[in-house]
């Protein structure tokens, strides 16, 4: 039987002897522009804007102009209308067509699918300008990130950096942008989870994520663009730079992402917009929340500390002992009552549902 006890220290100075807290800095970028429609987005909306799947991509491309800039916003279309992703849009178009309550001729569906292919061809032939710090190519937020990365990776170094963003699209676009900008000492990677659904959303397996983390630990990758999946559970002792490109929403996100910086001389950078009171208040809230949480834990009386031995296991297992069980004679495997319910539910869920004709009432 496992016996354990949850313990912490009331004196944080003792904890800092073994676990170092990163040095925190606030990096301000100038006020962002309001979202606007780029020439590419305008032409696609005017020509194919009646297609629901295209409208969804256009909405994000329009939104991306403010935090990311025109280059990233236009490349949303390149991601969403790549060969594999265009087929995903075609399937979405078919599903939306079949969901229509009013009967429409199938020729209308064929015409919509053909227009999706036309949009794909239009984007493929578009002359994308290279990313530039001049004009609206990159937003002030991206330019500030570029400034930090240029300073860190201008020469060979052992810095391991994780850049946290909120959306998978953002991680992919920034990864493409900085790969395009090029730096001999910046080796990029991406950690965005396994969810797969929206157009342009790349499918990444669990194995690929594990390999990415292994390369990051070895130093083959020294800069990761990551979503919230990387906030919890990563133990990389050499990680010494965390950049919150998109600010956290909760105290837990703040503490967990800060905990990824394990190196003795680590930095944690909060990127905020100049004059943005919400960003300033967000930082103030999480810092105050951490103080309140620490005081609460220190104020717990002794009888509320978790010892791990205050549970009567015999009473908890009493019902289980009363239930029957079956032991397979050939393998020795035992099937208990509770586990049999899980097996039965899985079996029933796998059965093919049969539809029977409704009986007429006489």
Go through the PLM ranges and name each one.
Residues 6, 153-156, 182, 190, ...:
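Eukaryotic basic, amphipathic alpha-helical target segments in cytosolic regions
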Residues 309-361:
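N-terminal segment of the canonical double-stranded RNA-binding domain
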Residues 219, 256-289:
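Conserved segment of the helicase C-terminal RecA-like domain
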Residues 1-181:
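Helicase motor interdomain insertion/brace
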Residues 160-164, 170-176, 185-227:
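Conserved helicase ATPase core of P-loop NTP-dependent helicases/translocases
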Residues 193-197, 222, 228-264:
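Conserved RecA-like helicase motor core of SF1/SF2 enzymes
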Residues 170-173, 197-200, 232-233, 250-252, ...:
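Eukaryotic short linear interaction motifs
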Residues 282-322:
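Long, hydrophobic alpha-helical segments
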């Amino acid at each position: 039987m496992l016996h354990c006890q949850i313990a912490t220290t009331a004196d944080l100075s003792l904890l800092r002897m073994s676990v170092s807290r990163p040095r925190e800095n606030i990096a301000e970028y100038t006020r962002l522009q309001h979202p606007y429609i780029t020439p590419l987005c305008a032409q696609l909306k005017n020509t194919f804007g009646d297609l629901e799947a295209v409208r969804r991509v256009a909405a994000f491309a329009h939104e991306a102009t403010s935090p990311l800039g025109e280059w990233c916003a236009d490349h949303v279309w390149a991601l969403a209308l790549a060969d594999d992703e265009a087929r995903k849009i075609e399937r979405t178009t078919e599903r939306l067509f079949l969901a229509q309550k009013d009967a429409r001729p199938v020729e209308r569906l064929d015409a919509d699918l053909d227009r999706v292919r036309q949009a794909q061809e239009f984007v493929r032939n578009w002359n994308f300008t290279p990313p530039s710090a001049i004009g609206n190519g990159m937003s002030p937020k991206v330019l500030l990130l570029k400034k930090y990365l240029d300073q860190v990776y201008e020469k060979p170094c052992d810095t391991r950096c994780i850049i946290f963003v909120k959306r998978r699209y953002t991680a992919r676009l920034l990864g493409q942008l900085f790969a395009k900008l090029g730096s001999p000492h910046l080796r990029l990677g991406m950690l965005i989870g396994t969810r797969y659904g929206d157009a342009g959303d790349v499918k990444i397996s669990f194995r690929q994520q594990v390999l990415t983390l292994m390369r990051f630990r070895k130093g083959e990758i020294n800069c990761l663009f990551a979503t919230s999946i990387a906030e919890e559970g990563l133990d990389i002792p050499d990680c010494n730079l965390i950049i919150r490109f998109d600010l956290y929403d909760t105290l837990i996100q703040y503490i967990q992402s800060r905990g990824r910086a394990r190196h003795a001389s680590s930095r944690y950078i909060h990127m905020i917009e100049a004059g943005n009171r919400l960003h300033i208040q967000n930082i103030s809230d999480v810092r105050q929340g951490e103080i309140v949480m620490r005081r609460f834990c220190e104020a717990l009386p002794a009888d509320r500390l978790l010892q791990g031995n205050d549970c009567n296991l015999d009473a908890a297992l009493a019902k289980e002992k009363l239930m029957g069980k079956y032991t397979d004679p050939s393998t020795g495997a035992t099937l208990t009552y509770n586990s049999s319910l899980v097996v039965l539910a899985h079996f029933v869920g796998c059965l093919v549902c049969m539809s029977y004709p409704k009986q007429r009432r006489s």
